[in-house]
């Protein structure tokens, strides 16, 4: 059971119902004058309340103004607030104050291109004048003031570019032997004596810093320098020769000492050669002036400064001596190391050259040997060919002569045997033999037997001839004998040829002069006839 007086959940206030005014019913016997009196009194009360409220507000305004006179300056306060907002937020600034991001770089690039184009045109005009070869030298050349100004500006720009190139060469770390100048500039930038270089290359080209020489108050003139500092001077001169950037420092001009620096620049312009040759002497003069100015400040400050300067001077002398000894030892080590490297390199290159020479000689010798071998082999091959050809030719000649002699001897024997048979055999017997031969030739069975008989007879004759040749005299004697026989037989043949020739058939019996020879003898005879008819010699295959 919940307690009746308490509520749970979201409690919302109830809307108060407007009170309905209870209208009095007008009485029949009432009069209108009573209503007029009530309305007048109410209006008077309202006016009195208004006047009282006005007086109250005036009093409050006076009190507030007495406390703070700027209480009711709303517009000025609002304007100040808006200005602060605009200052804090740069995006809300008007467009006139905003600067473009990229157009100034583009304009610089356009100017550079214009100047380059002008230089090109000048070179082109110069070439055209050279091509003319002085045709128009007698005529006047008009030069305007604007062109003169342009030439002056161009000369100034060329000087600036030369300075920028020299500055870049001095600041280039790759061209320096050590990093002393780089670390000195880095230290000056960290301390604040030198402004850090800008990243933009074009800004670095246009904005070129002037080179300033900084002096130290503890240094004295070069004439009054003690003999102990000669080592320091030598080291400084060597560093200036080796590293031109080591003794150069760049400082930004300040508003306080602007006049002094202008005076120094003028004096430097008068004595440029002396300052370039002896930069430390120039430093000493500048620092002697500064020390003379400082002397007039006070005796106490002077005494303290002189004591501190003396200590610093001694420390610096000791440091300079130590650094001089270190530099000497370092240079000696460097020179010895370089000498060793150079000797090592020379030895290495000499070794390589000797090896290359040896290799080249070996290659030449090999090539000569190979060439000689090739020549010798080619010559030997030619000689062998000539010998083989000569041997073959001689062998062929021998074979041919032997065959000729063999055939001649065979013919002679055949002729002798034929004559002897003609004498012995009668004519009848010759006719029967001829018939018998014709029958043999006509019958096909008897042909192979006849061939076999002929071959056997030819073989037997050959063997007899070989035996007879062994027992016979030499070829020259046989040739003479054969010549005599042929001479004797010629008249007999001539008498036989005088007789009228008879029609001889194809298969007729041959005469005794045309003796039958074997197939092999006929073949050899044909071959010999062909060989004798040829004017050249055939090469036989191996």
Swiss-Prot record:
* Annotated family: Belongs to the NSRP1 family.
Locate the cross-link: Glycyl lysine isopeptide (Lys-Gly) (interchain with G-Cter in SUMO2): 198, 209, 280
Taxonomic lineage per UniProt? Eukaryota, Metazoa, Chordata, Craniata, Vertebrata
Residues recorded as bearing N6-acetyllysine in the entry: 277
The Gene Ontology CC terms held by the record are: nuclear speck; nucleus; ribonucleoprotein complex
* Lineage top rank: taxon: Eukaryota
| Function per UniProt | RNA-binding protein that mediates pre-mRNA alternative splicing regulation.
For this chain, the annotated S-S bridges are none
| UniProt keyword list | Acetylation, Coiled coil, Isopeptide bond, mRNA processing, mRNA splicing, Nucleus, Phosphoprotein, RNA-binding, Ubl conjugation
Q: What is this protein called?
A: Nuclear speckle splicing regulatory protein 1
Q: Extract the ranges annotated as region (Disordered).
A: 21-53, 190-516
Give the knockout phenotype: Mice show early embryonic lethality shortly after implantation.
Q: Where is this region: Necessary for alternative splicing activity?
A: 105-169
Per UniProt, the ranges with Basic and acidic residues bias are 200-217, 257-271, 309-335, 343-475, 485-501
Question: Which portions of the chain have biased composition (kind: Polar residues)?
Answer: 223-232
Stretches of Basic residues bias are at 277-288
Q: Where in the cell is it found?
A: Nucleus; Nucleus speckle
Phosphoserine is found on: 27, 31, 33, 254-255, 443
Listed GO biological process terms: developmental process; in utero embryonic development; mRNA processing; regulation of alternative mRNA splicing, via spliceosome; RNA splicing
> To which species is this protein native?
Mus musculus
Transmembrane stretches, start-end: none
Q: Name one GO molecular function term.
A: mRNA binding
């Amino acid at each position: 059971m919940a307690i009746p007086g308490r509520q749970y959940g979201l409690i919302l206030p109830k809307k108060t119902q407007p009170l309905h005014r209870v209208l009095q019913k007008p009485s029949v016997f009432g009069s209108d004058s009573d209503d007029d009196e009530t309305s007048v009194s109410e209006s008077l009360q309202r006016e009195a309340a208004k006047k009282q409220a006005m007086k109250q507000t005036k009093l409050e305004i006076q009190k507030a103004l007495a406390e703070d006179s700027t209480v009711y300056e709303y517009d000025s306060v609002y304007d100040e607030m808006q200005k602060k907002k605009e200052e804090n937020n740069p995006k809300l600034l008007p467009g006139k104050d905003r600067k473009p991001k990229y157009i100034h770089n583009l304009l610089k690039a356009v100017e550079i291109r214009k100047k380059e184009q002008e230089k090109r045109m000048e070179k082109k005009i110069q070439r055209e004048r050279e091509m003319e070869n002085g045709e128009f030298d007698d005529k006047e050349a008009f030069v305007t003031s604007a062109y003169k100004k342009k030439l002056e500006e161009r000369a100034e720009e060329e000087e600036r570019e030369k300075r920028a190139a020299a500055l870049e060469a001095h600041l280039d770390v790759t061209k320096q032997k050590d990093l002393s100048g780089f670390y000195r500039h880095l230290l000056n930038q960290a301390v604040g004596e030198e402004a850090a270089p800008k990243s933009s290359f074009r800004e670095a080209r246009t904005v070129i810093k002037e080179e300033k020489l900084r002096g130290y108050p503890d240094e004295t003139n070069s004439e009054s320098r003690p003999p102990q500092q000669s080592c320091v001077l030598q080291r400084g001169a060597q560093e200036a020769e080796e590293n031109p950037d080591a003794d150069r420092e760049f400082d930004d001009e300040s508003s306080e000492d602007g006049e002094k620096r202008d005076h120094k620049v003028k004096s430097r312009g008068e004595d440029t050669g002396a300052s370039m040759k002896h930069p430390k002497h120039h430093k000493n003069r500048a620092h002697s002036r500064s020390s003379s100015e400082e002397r007039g400040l006070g005796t106490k400050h002077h005494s303290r400064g002189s004591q501190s300067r003396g200590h610093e001077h001694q420390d610096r002398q000791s440091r300079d001596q130590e650094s001089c000894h270190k530099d000497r030892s370092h240079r000696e080590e460097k020179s010895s190391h370089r000498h060793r490297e150079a000797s090592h390199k020379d030895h290495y290159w000499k070794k390589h050259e000797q090896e290359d020479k040896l290799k080249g000689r070996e290659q030449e010798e090999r090539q000569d040997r190979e060439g000689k071998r090739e020549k010798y082999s080619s010559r030997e091959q030619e000689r062998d060919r000539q010998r083989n050809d000569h041997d073959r030719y001689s062998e062929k000649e021998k074979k041919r002569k032997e065959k000729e002699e063999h055939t001649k001897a065979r013919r002679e024997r055949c002729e002798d045997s034929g004559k002897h048979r003609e004498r012995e055999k009668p004519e009848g017997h010759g006719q029967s033999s001829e018939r018998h031969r014709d029958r043999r030739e006509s019958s096909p069975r008897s042909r192979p037997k006849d061939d076999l008989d002929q071959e056997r007879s030819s073989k037997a004759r050959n063997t007899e001839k070989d035996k007879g040749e062994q027992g016979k005299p030499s070829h020259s004697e046989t040739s003479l004998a054969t010549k005599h026989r042929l001479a004797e037989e010629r008249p007999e043949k001539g008498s036989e040829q005088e007789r009228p020739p008879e029609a001889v058939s194809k298969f007729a019996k041959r005469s005794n002069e045309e003796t039958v020879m074997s197939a092999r003898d006929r073949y050899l005879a044909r071959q010999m006839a062909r060989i004798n008819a040829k004017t050249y010699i055939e090469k036989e295959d191996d």
